[in-house]
Curated annotation (Swiss-Prot):
Main location: cytoplasm
Reaction equations catalysed: [protein]-L-glutamate 5-O-methyl ester + H2O = L-glutamyl-[protein] + methanol + H(+); L-glutaminyl-[protein] + H2O = L-glutamyl-[protein] + NH4(+)
GO terms for MF: phosphorelay response regulator activity; protein-glutamate methylesterase activity; protein-glutamine glutaminase activity
Protein name: Protein-glutamate methylesterase/protein-glutamine glutaminase 2
Alphabetical list of HAMAP family matching this protein: CheB_chemtxs
Assigned protein family: Belongs to the CheB family.
Length: 363
């Protein structure tokens, strides 16, 4: 019988600690080995028994969660799932959590927290189980000076995508390529590593990164400050063009569209697709319909299977498709599913993706 995943819960709220314990221990594969009201108690608990996963609040007495997260990753890396009542004004804090090494962030409301956690039981257990298998990587410090240079019921994307339009114009070959990237758990820092390595005049890039609403704007701002390419949160109608990276806003789907030789994005509401909004499948399938062989599809680290079928559609439409390899994926879920479907032309490690983007995008 496989060993249970051992979890340490760190939260200053006694009721949250109790509710989280009940939720996690309802899964037969998870065991809560302890709880702590603050990082100091947590540190002593870790010395007694090292957990497989830590769930961590951010706002706590004596030491904030981000400081504790940085100490964990510097001294004894352990997969950490941040579970906190962050609001849109705390979006920079969320960025700091991902930068410090958090595997995932679960948002809990400031009121009705216990009920929310109970309703999110399956998601929370899935995230913790994915975190237990995460490959923690030491990422290079952000900054221009030292970055590498390169010359629920699951709906399909049909619920969001418009019916296909007859005619050959949408599939006609143009001189410009569009790079479509999908990522989830572990993607924030992996994307940073890829985008930092690209020069300003790189091919156009559109990205779906699973992330809560309002946090994508801060994520885009952070990347824009680090990268030579322009990085922005997409708004409806934004032009897709060389030198620009568009990131789908949280809680909205992003579709690639085409008018003549011009590509642009449509940002829209819609149901959850593959349990996500934005959905990688929605972006990839729209790229298959409107870009065809002009597109390059890349599926990166993340749990679940969002994007796998969409990548297969891109490949069938003539796009060049890539899956990140297992060794460099924080969570080898989405790429694994895509590879199993035969959706990937090539499987590459993270450090080779920037070079391949330039090669494929300029072909």
């Amino acid at each position: 019988m496989p060993r249970k995943i051992r979890v340490l819960i760190v939260d200053d709220s006694a009721s949250v600690r109790q509710t989280m314990t009940e939720i996690l221990e309802s899964d037969p594969g998870i065991e809560v080995i302890g709880t702590a009201p603050d990082p100091y108690v947590a540190a002593r608990r870790i010395q007694q028994e090292v957990p497989d996963v830590i769930t961590l609040d951010v706002e706590m007495p004596r030491m904030d969660g981000i400081t504790f997260l940085r100490k964990i990753m510097a001294q004894r890396p352990i997969p950490v799932v941040v579970c906190s009542s962050l609001t849109e004004t705390d979006s920079e804090t969320a960025s700091q959590a991902w930068e410090a090494g958090a595997v995932e962030i679960i948002l809990k409301p400031r009121v009705g927290t216990a009920q929310f956690l109970l309703e999110s039981k399956i998601h929370i257990c899935d995230v913790v189980k994915a975190a237990a298998g995460a490959r923690l990587r030491s990422m290079p410090a952000a900054g221009r000076a030292n970055r590498p240079r390169v010359p629920e019921k699951k709906l399909t994307a049909d619920a969001v995508l418009p019916p296909p339009v007859a005619g050959r114009n949408a599939m006609a070959r143009t001189t410009e390529s569009v790079i479509c990237i999908g990522a989830s758990t572990g993607g924030t820092e992996s994307l940073r590593e890829v985008l930092e390595a690209l020069p300003a005049a790189s091919p156009a890039i559109v990205i779906v990164q699973h992330m809560p609403e309002k946090f994508t704007e801060a994520f885009a701002r952070r990347l824009d400050s680090l990268c030579d390419m322009e990085v922005k949160e997409a708004v409806d109608g934004d032009t897709v063009m060389r030198g620009r990276v568009l990131i789908a806003p949280g809680n909205h789907h992003m579709l690639l569209q085409r008018s003549g030789a011009r590509y642009y994005v449509s940002v829209k509401d819609g149901p959850l697709v593959s349990r996500h909004r934005p959905s990688v499948d929605v972006l990839f399938r729209s790229a298959a319909s409107h870009a065809g062989s002009n597109a390059v599809g890349i599926i990166m680290t993340g749990m679940g299977d969002d994007g796998a079928r969409g990548l297969l559609e891109m490949r069938k439409a003539g796009a060049y498709t890539i899956a990140q390899d297992e060794a460099t994926s924080v969570v080898f879920g989405m790429p694994k599913e895509a590879i199993a479907l035969g959706a990937a032309d090539k499987i590459l490690p993270l450090e080779m993706l920037a070079m391949e983007i330039l090669r494929a995008g300029n072909r």
